[in-house]
């Protein structure tokens, strides 16, 4: 709501500035009136669009929840991927690897995956050379 008030104040200020310009002849006066009418129409459209965005708090909440869901799914994916890599690398069962991953922090899991895939990318790059 406060964004709407600020935008309305800016529009009013620009309208006052535009109307305060002196018009020297009738031709210029007609031209200024035409410009003001066009500006008023543009402002009306802009304010209408701004009114549609008045539900910004609700929109922010929606994307915040969506981001949290995506982040949660990514963390689950990282855990599964790390467990799979550990099981393959160390020759242990999947359950043992998952238990090992559960003892790791989120940061440790991400670092482990970055190291693993970094080494893999480096090996592929060196093979191409």
Curated annotation (Swiss-Prot):
The keyword Cell inner membrane does not apply. Insecticidal, cytolytic and antimicrobial peptide. Has insecticidal activity against the flesh fly S.carnaria. Has antibacterial activity against the Gram-negative bacteria E.coli. Forms voltage-dependent, ion-permeable channels in membranes. At high concentration causes cell membrane lysis. The lineage of its organism: Eukaryota, Metazoa, Ecdysozoa, Arthropoda, Chelicerata. GO terms for molecular function: toxin activity. Its main location: secreted. GO terms for biological process: cytolysis by host of symbiont cells; defense response to Gram-negative bacterium; defense response to Gram-positive bacterium. Keywords: Antibiotic, Antimicrobial, Cytolysis, Hemolysis, Secreted, Signal, Toxin. This is M-zodatoxin-Lt8h. Expressed by the venom gland. One of its GO terms (cellular component) is extracellular region. It is found in: Secreted. Coiled coil: none annotated. The keyword Lipid metabolism does not apply. Residues 21-60 form a propeptide. Transmembrane segments: none annotated. Residues 1-20 form the signal peptide. Belongs to the cationic peptide 06 (cytoinsectotoxin) family.
């Amino acid at each position: 709501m406060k964004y709407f008030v600020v935008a309305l104040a800016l529009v009013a200020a620009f309208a006052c500035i535009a109307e305060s310009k002196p018009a020297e002849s009738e031709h210029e006066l007609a031209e200024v009136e035409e410009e003001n009418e066009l500006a008023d129409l543009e402002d009306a459209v802009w304010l209408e669009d701004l009114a549609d965005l008045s539900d910004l708090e609700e929109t922010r909440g929606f994307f915040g929840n969506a981001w949290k869901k995506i982040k949660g799914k990514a963390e689950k994916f990282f855990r599964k991927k790390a467990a799979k890599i550990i099981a393959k690398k160390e020759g242990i069962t999947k359950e043992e690897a998952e238990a090992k991953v559960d003892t790791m922090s989120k940061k440790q899991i991400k670092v482990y995956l970055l190291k693993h895939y970094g080494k893999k990318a480096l090996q592929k790059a060196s093979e191409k050379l």
